[in-house]
Amino acid sequence: MATYVIGDLQGCLTPLVQLLEQINYQPQLDKLWFAGDLINRGEESLETLRFIKSLGSNATIVLGNHDLHLLAVSHGYGKLKRGDTLAEILTASDRDDLMNWLRQQPLFHYDEQLNTVMTHAGIPPCWDLAKTQSLAKEVEKKLKSDSVDDFFATMYGNTPDTWSDELTGLDRLRAITNYLTRMRFCDENSKLDLKSKEGINTAEKGFAPWFNYPSKVPEDCHIVFGHWAALEGKTQLERIHALDTGCVWGGSLTALRLEDKQRFSTPCTLNRKNS
């Protein structure tokens, strides 16, 4: 039995099928983790969502910012952006079933036996493992509730950009969501810079990648995340694993086998909507 963590798919089903063949995926034995951003920008978003849903209990998913964007648009909030490839999902006959399934998915996953935690963007320096799990559950509870519309109506935005335990209501939920699904750079106080999106050397003065600061997560716990294609899968830290290797941009799709930390990848052709 093996557990594989797979980076951002963004609607690229063909490379996923190729990668599963490469690792000789055995459904009766192996488990798959997906680090979020299952859909959007790639041309196979609907097929990708259906495929991952069909994996059932074999697949463990955390939501990414593109997945939340799809949910917000499906609820009538937010607008389709240039380059989005969500229209086919939004007009699909099984749209409601897919959306109901998607909003049941978590933002945080921790496996005690493998001593590995997964979120889409990472874990800020100011949170320990228990706090991250607890805060993620606040958003997950809202996503599953009948009052989710007010969350989607106020989900977009870059503030509050600094965590405080005193935050309440929708501001609190937006901050949690931004840390778990949009974070790249922060300062020593975990203040977010959500405008810089490129490589490590592009940080604004006083900011650095979140994983460059001392972490409150135990040193023997591994952190796996996606979201940041410009890292090209590299953090220079043995226990922190970046898995977005730019599949939709013509890079590669990467899987990390958790039992021995071996990486597998398959090259991708540019699979992005030309707009």
What are these regions (language model features)?
Residues 1-51, 55, 68:
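N-terminal active-site segment of His-dependent metallophosphoesterases
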Residues 133-275:
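Acidic, His/Gly-rich catalytic cores of divalent-metal-dependent hydrolytic chemistry
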Residues 27-30, 56-58, 118, 220:
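A general structural motif
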Residues 5, 34, 61-62, 117, ...:
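Residue-level marker for buried hydrophobic side chains located in beta-strands
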Residues 2-10, 116-122, 242-243:
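Active-site-proximal beta-strand elements of phosphoester/diester hydrolases
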Residues 12-13, 40-42, 66-72, 126, ...:
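Active-site environment of divalent metal-dependent phosphoester hydrolases
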Residues 46-48, 54-169:
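Active-site neighborhood of divalent metal-dependent phosphoester bond hydrolases
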Residues 8, 37, 64-65, 102, ...:
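Divalent metal-coordination and catalytic microenvironments
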